[in-house]
Amino acid sequence: MTDNLNFTMKFDLDKDKEKKAREIIFTVYQSLEEKGYNPTNQFVGYILSGDPTYITSHNNARSLIRQIERDELLEELLKSYLNTK
């Protein structure tokens, strides 16, 4: 068990999951905007709490966001952020 502390675990998403996550993020973002919410605040609330009620059910966004894990969501958001800087 202590030997495992000397190694770094690798987290990797396959390309299909990345594409699906990206599409879901854009769809959910657009749905939140359409309903008048601040999408950034709503995503942060969802990521921190895991509570899907931060995401509107408009356009089935709440069901969509639950198709991807929060760590996958965070990974896509971070990649996008770093690629724009």
Swiss-Prot record:
InterPro entries: IreB. Signal peptide: none annotated. Pfam families: IreB. It comes from the Bacteria. NCBIfam families: PRK05473.1. Belongs to the UPF0297 family. This is UPF0297 protein Clos_1665.
